[in-house]
A protein has these predicted regions:
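Claisen-condensing/thiolase-fold acyl-transfer catalytic domains that form or cleave C-C bonds
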Residues: 59, 63-66, 89-90, 108-110, ...
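Phosphate/pyrophosphate-binding loops at sites that engage ATP/ADP/AMP, CoA/4′-phosphopantetheine
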Residues: 65-81, 240-257, 305-310
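Short beta-strand segments
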Residues: 12-15, 86, 117, 142-148, ...
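Glycine/charged-rich beta-loop-alpha catalytic/anionic-binding loops adjacent to active sites
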Residues: 46-48, 79-84, 103-116, 151, ...
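Condensing-enzyme catalytic core mediating Claisen C-C bond formation in acyl metabolism
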Residues: 1-55, 155-232, 236, 240, ...
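A structural motif shared across PLP-dependent enzymes of the aminotransferase-like
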Residues: 28-35, 60, 89-100, 264-267
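Flexible, glycine-rich active-site loops centered on histidine and acidic residues
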Residues: 135-162
Length: 346
């Protein structure tokens, strides 16, 4: 997709919910893996993660976030014209999780509700999708719920989270600028190869097998990630994409208050920051405490690190998500007068 601009769309607010359960990468592992985990934490920067209870779905976290946001905004339920759910952890393969949440949230039947399957890069795509509905004139107020449930005790990277963001029509609102991209030739770099129609789940896919001599165990139904390919993709694609969007918007790096990137790992994120020449204080991070929360990582970081600053005055924020697909999206948005309630634990 070419770069694009949305006008008359206001960023009204955001809420984020994470599980109460905290998993430590250093202590919640087998004793024989302790030394390896210590080295890993130094490289990826993830010390603790949030993991949902067995009964919790992504939709439960997103529901709590949406409830808190609607309360903070004092929006009436009947005013919500659109509900978009962006996740790779739906409640069911069918129906759409958005339909279920439309009912749980008490939204009217006139609310258009649908799901989008996207992970790490999800947030800029989600803002563009909802913003486009609003800019087209058919939607006045809408919610987009983004997040996933991908954490496990044995995986040191991923965390669970659900987020809600509200956009509304506002004549004369500062423009939102976007640049969204996809490269499906790299789809195998991050993939769940089993569970779809290409490879239905069989009994053999559920059996754990030893991956290497370090006592790592894996199942065919688990996420497969090519770390080298992801590192190369992220560090090569993201910096030029940021420069491209800034040039398109006629903005300089000095004019941007915060640069919020998908929280992949320390090595990737630090390489991107240094390539762009950005000061640490302009690049908030939640990797240490929350790990990689997939599509929710941008809202998690905004809520957990800079929500008070975002509420206090007008801020120009550049948001960049990248990963599964492969895909990457960048958004430049001015935020003023928006609601950012504190992080919810559920």
């Amino acid at each position: 997709m070419a770069t694009s601009t949305l006008k008359n769309v206001r960023f009204a607010g955001m809420a984020t919910c994470v599980p109460k359960r905290v998993i430590s990468n250093l202590t919640d592992c087998k004793p024989q893996l302790r030394a390896e985990r210590e080295r890993l934490v130094r490289n990826i920067g993830i010390e603790t993660r949030r993991m949902a209870q067995e009964w919790q779905c992504f939709s439960d976290l997103a529901f709590d976030a949406a409830e808190r946001l609607l309360e903070s905004l004092e929006w009436k339920r009947e005013e919500v014209d659109a509900l978009i759910v962006v996740t790779q952890s739906p409640d069911y393969l069918a129906p759409a999780t958005a339909s279920i949440l439309q009912d749980r949230l008490g939204l009217p039947h006139s609310t258009v509700a649908f799901d989008v399957n996207l992970g790490c890069s999800a947030y800029p795509f989600a803002l563009n999708l909802l913003g486009s509905l609003i800019a087209a004139g058919g939607v006045k107020k809408g919610l987009v719920l983004v997040g996933d449930r991908g954490a496990s005790v044995n995986d040191p990277i991923f965390s669970d989270a659900g987020t809600a963001t509200a956009l509304e029509f506002c004549e004369g609102a500062p423009p939102m600028h976007f640049d969204l991209n996809s490269d499906g030739s790299g789809y195998k770099a991050i993939i769940l190869p089993v569970g779809g129609h290409r490879e239905p789940v069989g009994v053999q896919h559920l059996m754990p097998f030893r991956e290497d001599e370090n006592d790592h165990w894996h199942r065919a139904i688990d996420l497969q990630l090519d770390g080298t390919a992801v590192l190369s993709f992220s560090t090569q694609r993201v910096p030029p994409a940021v420069e491209k969007l800034l040039d398109y918007a006629g903005a300089s790096k000095d004019e941007v208050d915060y640069f919020v990137f998908h929280q992949a790992n320390r090595m990737i994120n630090e390489t991107i920051r240094k390539k762009l020449g950005l000061p640490v204080e302009k690049v908030p991070s939640t990797l240490r405490d929350f790990g990689n929360t997939s599509g929710a990582s941008l809202p998690v970081t905004m809520t957990a690190r800079i929500n008070r600053e975002l509420e206090a005055g007008r801020n120009r924020v550049l948001l960049c998500g990248f990963g599964i697909g492969l895909s990457w999206g960048t958004c430049l948005v001015d935020i003023e007068g928006a609601k950012f309630p504190d992080l919810i634990e559920s």
